[in-house]
Amino acid sequence: MILELADIRIQPGQQAAFEEAIARGLSTVAVRAKGYQGAKVNHGIENPERYVLQIFWDTLEDHTVGFRESPLFTEWRAIVGPFFAAPPVVEHFELSFKSA
C-alpha cells in the first residue's frame, strides 16, 4: 500500500466550500480510480487554510500513472483546483512501522 500526502493551501475564507468540494471529489471521482483504497482529509489548526490530504493506493503507479494521466484527474482538479492558493506539494510513502 502507498500513502499519498498532499499538502494543500487554499484561498482564505474558503474552508467550508473547499471541504464540501474535496468530499465530493473523493466520493465521486477518486473512488472510480484503479487502486484507490480510501482517503482522509486533515484540517490545519494553527493555519486554517492548510489541509493535509491522505490518499491510500494499491501501488505508486495507480496514482502517478493510472489516476494522474487519466480523465479522472481532470475531473478532480476541476472540483478542487479553484480553491488552491498554490499547487499542492505531493509526496508518497510506504509504511515502515505500525503500532498495535
Regions found by a protein language model. Give the residues of each.
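Active-site-flanking beta-strand signature of metal-NTP-handling nucleotidyl enzymes
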Residues: 3-8
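Short hydrophobic/aromatic beta-strand micro-patches
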Residues: 9, 42, 54-56
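Glycine-rich beta-strand-turn "strand-cap" elements at beta-sheet edges
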Residues: 2, 40-49, 75-100
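An amphipathic, aromatic/His-enriched active-site/gating alpha helix that lines ligand/cofactor pockets
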Residues: 24, 28-36, 56-89
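Short, surface-exposed ligand-recognition loops at beta-strand->loop->(often short) alpha-helix junctions
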Residues: 9-21
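Residue-level signal for secondary-structure boundary sites
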Residues: 16, 61-63, 98-100
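Feature marks short, surface-exposed loop/turn motifs that line or immediately flank catalytic pockets
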Residues: 12-14, 45-47, 59-61
